[in-house]
Amino acid sequence: METFVRLFKDSPQQRSNAWHATRRTQVGGSDLASILGLNPYKSYYITLAEKANLFKKNLNHAACSWGTLFERVSKDLLELFCQTTVIGDNIHIDGTYLGYPGHSNSPDGFCHLTLGYTQQSWEIKTIFNDVCYETTKRIPVLVEIKSPFNRKIKNSVPSYYMPQIQSGLALSPPISMGIYVEAMFRVCSIHQLGWNHETNTDIHPPESMLPLAWGIITICSTQEHTEAPQDFGTLNAEAFHQLLETLYQKNQYTIHYSMPYETACPEMSNVVGYFGWKVFIFQIIPVMKHPQFLKDKYPIIQQFLHDLHTLKTSPSPMEAYEKICCSKESLLSTEDIDDFTNMLT
């Protein structure tokens, strides 16, 4: 696994300008559900128009900021709960090296997990498992992390995330299993931190269970800031959403993360504010590699890239776009969609 990750040490770093530029010319793992017709929030045609710069992406900046903030926290918790180390969380895997030019994947990382065997089945060993296993084995896995702001967490992988995971597995030959990590975080004030269910109930519904862990996110200005830091965990829902929108302007702020279970704010300069977090659900769902996935779906990727090239080279891209939209039939059958549902186990 480590040798594989080192192959891509010089690839564009995730979320860098070079990475964004590369992504505009390729079908990334996170684009796949849309072009396969599996994403209920974005279609093939919207994705095509975005990559061709026919209109700007209609991003929910608050949701993007939330996901980015808590991706780092989720990795820290995964390392703690599974006694592992996540690597390769900044690499970009170009599919050209495996014969899939134009396709790429930017994984949330890779790590080793311990599987324990008991009662005729294998399970992922965590610090919460008080089990004496008959035998154990250590395996490398691909990591995919999601931290929804409001969506209810179920004990399964949403079908529209499965293509992203299978893409990562297909472009990572040494890896035969992925894990889908989904966590439910809640905001709280600094004074609410600790082993209790207290949270900011204006931002999220109240919780009755106790948290698995907690910590602090500190926001610092890149400019000199002398005002007293604010506890953002006391904001109302509207003001907190505005904060998340503001944090999307990444060049204005730096983010610092406490270790899990800390309750004291760190001493540092230019602190604008901070807020506490608690995690109440932390699911780790195994996903096995589907050997034929990319081979079967690559023709659709090629068709998308052909359409994208048509738009970018057309003297009248809007007319070309309308023609593509009017002429194209569904690219994915009902049977294909059912297959993805069956892949969830």
Curated annotation (Swiss-Prot):
What InterPro entries does the database record attribute to this sequence?
NF-kappa-B_Signaling_Reg, PDDEXK-like_dom_sf, Restrct_endonuc-II-like, YqaJ_viral_recombinase
Q: Which GO terms describe its biological process?
A: symbiont-mediated suppression of host NF-kappaB cascade
Keyword Chaperone tagged? no
Can you name this protein?
Answer: Protein D345L
Print the keywords alphabetically: Host cytoplasm, Host-virus interaction, Inhibition of host NF-kappa-B by virus
Give compartment(s). Host cytoplasm
Q: What is annotated about its quaternary structure and interactions? A: Interacts with IKKA/CHUK and IKBKB.
